[in-house]
Amino acid sequence: SFAGAEAANASQLQSIARQVRGAVNAVAGQVTGNGGSGNSGTSAAAANPNSDNTASIADRGTSAIMTTASATASSTGVDGGIAATYAVASQWDGGYVANYTITQFGRDFDDRLAVAIHFA
């Protein structure tokens, strides 16, 4: 039924949104020195955020594993999933500019994907 299909798609989109939010928050936390998921130390990127430090995370339905050396997290899985990349473009005293790239993997592109980024 139409209602069943809508409910299934809404659930799938909510799952993707949670994955993206977790991915971006984990990477942003690593680069800005606010911690991040799965890592108790400060990454090299957090200690010295500049244009040479790039952090990425990929999630394809499994939990990500953070590594401190490159502030990168990745996982493997089946067809589909997302990747979020965060890179510091420039910085100055008291601030910086960063670029985010969100990529969706899989056979079918879902143009309903929306990303909201909130910093605490």
From Swiss-Prot:
<comment type="subunit">
    <text>Forms a complex with PE9. The complex interacts with human TLR4.</text>
</comment>
<keyword id="KW-0964">Secreted</keyword>
<comment type="function">
    <text>Together with PE9, induces macrophage apoptosis through human Toll-like receptor 4 (TLR4) signaling pathway. Interaction with TLR4 leads to increased levels of phospho-IRF-3, increase in the transcript levels of IFN-beta and pro-apoptotic genes, up-regulation of IL-10, down-regulation of IL-1b and enhanced levels of macrophage apoptosis.</text>
</comment>
<dbReference type="GO" id="GO:0005576">
    <property type="term" value="C:extracellular region"/>
</dbReference>
<comment type="similarity">
    <text>Belongs to the mycobacterial PE family.</text>
</comment>
<keyword id="KW-0843">Virulence</keyword>
<feature type="compositionally biased region" description="Low complexity">
    <location>
        <begin position="40"/>
        <end position="51"/>
    </location>
</feature>
<keyword id="KW-0134">Cell wall</keyword>
<protein>
    <recommendedName>
        <fullName>PE family protein PE10</fullName>
    </recommendedName>
</protein>
<feature type="region of interest" description="Disordered">
    <location>
        <begin position="29"/>
        <end position="59"/>
    </location>
</feature>
